[in-house]
């Protein structure tokens, strides 16, 4: 299960999606989320799904990486579907046992919510899969740079977010190593009910926290050795510049978001 968590991982490539400016990808993700949460009909969901499919195919990220990233949230997806099935009012499917508690409106709501969660996760994961942590930090800093006038530490905030995102795969790998070492000593993490499994994970927490603090200390030492002083006087080796492709992609996602909002108000 731990190996299925792919959030924060970066898959290098030279595709159009990889070469896009990180600011473009961040803005496109925001527009994509706006479009997704305003989708209410089969037509609008199909439009969002089509755009997501084009992005995935263009990025050449293997489908197994995306589906593997969905495995840890299967329980959340199933819980959401069940809640919508049984607790959405409307016309019952049939007057027979459990079916009397399931409505046609609940079925539609469950399908819509499951699709929304899956497409939301796949769309946001695609951002980290195709954008390196350094590029993501630079993009966030440039997008939020107007807030520097309010004396907000934008560079530090962007750096913190990037480091936190980058440490997710590292901590997952460390947890997997600790669990393997515990299993070699006779620990059992797979048998018993959910409470027994949770109790079995307690011995992992102490070495995991120690490892996390040690890595944080090593990172802080490395940054100090390189005379890191935040964003003060910092320059970039590769200056971010919008290209024609960035404007075209941004325009396409803007049209998608506005178009779906219009279709929503038209009842389509």
Regions found by a protein language model. Name each.
Residues 63, 79-84, 99-102, 227, ...:
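A general structural signal for short secondary-structure boundary/capping elements
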Residues 55-59, 64, 72-76, 80:
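Extended cationic-aromatic binding surfaces that line active-site or macromolecule-binding grooves
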Residues 70-187, 194:
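Juxtamembrane/interface alpha-helical elements of multi-pass membrane proteins
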Residues 14, 37, 61-65, 97, ...:
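Membrane-helix interfacial "entry" motifs
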Residues 1-44, 48-59, 142-145, 149-152, ...:
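Transmembrane alpha-helix interface motif
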